[in-house]
A protein has these predicted regions:
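Catalytic histidine-centered segment of alpha/beta-hydrolase-like enzymes
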Residues: 226-233
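Active-site machinery of serine-nucleophile hydrolases
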Residues: 70, 74-124
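Catalytic active-site module of serine/aspartate enzymes centered on a nucleophile-bearing elbow/loop
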Residues: 235-255
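Primarily recognizes the serine-hydrolase "nucleophile elbow" in alpha/beta-hydrolase
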Residues: 138-182
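Conserved alpha/beta-hydrolase "acid-adjacent" motif
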Residues: 196-201
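Gly/Ser-rich "nucleophile elbow"/oxyanion-hole loop immediately N-terminal to the catalytic nucleophile
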Residues: 59-66, 114-146
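A domain-start/cap signature at the N-terminus of enzymes
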Residues: 26-70, 150, 155, 167, ...
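Short beta-strand/loop motif that positions the catalytic acidic residue
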Residues: 188-190, 194
C-alpha cells in the first residue's frame, strides 16, 4: 500500500472514530428537537406517566430571550381515555387551539380510562417541561375542571409554593387543609345548580381559606348554571389577565437545558 493510500485510510478511520465518540458524548445526548409553535400531542415523558397536549405560543422560536408563563390544565372525567386530542374540547387547550397568540405555554395531560390524577407523576412531568422549555419559574399556574378541579385543590394543598396561582373550576377540596392555601392566589368557579359536584365544595374552601386569614381567594358563582362552569370561566379574558398578574416571590422549579 502506498503512503498516500495509507494516509487516506488513516484520515478515514480517525474521522469515523471521532464521529462515534461525539455521538456517544453527553453533548450529543442532550441534543433535543426544535419545538414546534402551536399545539401538538406529546408522548409520556416516562413509562406510566401521562401523554399530553403541548401548546407553544406564537413567537417562541423568534424571541429566544423571552421566558413564558406555564399553565397546567387538568381535564375532567369525560375526557379520560387514550385519545389525547380530547383534552382540547374544553378550557385553555381549546382557547389555544383557536388563538396562536395565547400567551401561556400550556401543558394538558391526558388521564387513562378509570384513572385519577397522580401528583407525583404530574410533578415529574412539569419538572421535565420546566427544564426543557423557556419557562418563567415565577409564573407557573394550575387550573382544572371537575375531576381536574378536585386535583387542582389537592395539588395546591400538597405544594402551595409551587404555583403562582390556581383556578379550580367545579371542583371540591379539603377544607380541613385549606390553611395551607392562605398565601396562594386562588380563584374558584362553580354553577349554583351543579348537581354533580355541589357548589358547597367551592364555598367551603373559600370560607376555610378566609377563616385562616387568607385574603387572596376569589369565588365566582354562576346563577342558574349546572356543572358546566368551565365554559364561562375559561371564556372570560379576566381569568387569564388575573393569572398573569400573579408571580411567585422566588422560583420553585429548575430551568436548565431549555430549548
Amino acid at each position: 500500500m502506498s503512503r498516500s493510500t495509507k494516509d487516506r485510510c488513516m484520515r478515514y478511520w480517525t474521522a469515523a472514530l471521532l464521529g462515534l465518540a461525539l455521538a456517544a458524548s453527553p453533548v450529543a445526548a442532550k441534543t433535543k428537537p426544535v419545538p414546534v409553535e402551536g399545539q401538538t400531542p406529546q408522548p409520556a415523558i416516562e413509562t406510566g406517566n401521562y401523554p399530553y397536549q403541548l401548546f407553544v405560543p406564537k413567537g417562541y422560536l423568534t424571541d429566544t430571550a423571552k421566558q413564558y408563563p406555564l399553565l397546567v390544565f387538568l381535564h375532567g372525567s369525560g375526557e379520560r381515555g387514550d385519545d389525547v386530542a380530547k383534552v382540547k374540547v374544553h378550557g385553555p387547550p381549546k382557547i389555544a387551539e383557536r388563538d396562536p397568540a395565547f400567551p401561556f405555554l400550556t401543558v394538558s395531560p391526558l388521564l387513562g380510562t378509570d384513572q385519577d390524577w397522580d401528583i407525583d407523576k404530574l410533578d415529574r412531568m412539569i419538572d421535565h417541561i420546566a427544564k426543557t422549555y423557556r419557562i418563567d419559574p415565577t409564573r407557573v399556574y394550575l387550573t382544572g375542571l371537575s375531576r381536574g378541579g378536585h386535583a387542582s385543590w389537592r395539588w395546591a394543598i400538597a405544594e402551595p409554593k409551587r404555583f403562582a396561582a390556581v383556578a379550580a373550576v367545579a371542583g371540591r377540596g379539603n377544607p380541613g387543609e385549606a390553611c395551607r392555601l392562605m398565601d396562594l392566589p386562588v380563584w374558584a368557579f362553580h354553577g349554583d345548580r351543579d348537581d354533580v359536584v355541589m357548589p358547597e365544595g367551592s364555598f367551603a374552601m373559600a370560607r376555610a381559606i378566609r377563616a385562616c386569614g387568607g385574603r387572596k381567594v376569589r369565588l365566582t358563582i354562576y346563577p342558574d348554571l349546572g356543572h358546566n362552569a368551565w365554559d364561562p370561566a375559561y371564556d372570560d379574558p379576566a381569568l387569564y389577565a388575573w393569572l398573569l398578574e400573579q408571580k411567585l416571590p422566588s422560583p420553585t422549579i429548575t430551568n436548565k437545558d431549555k430549548k
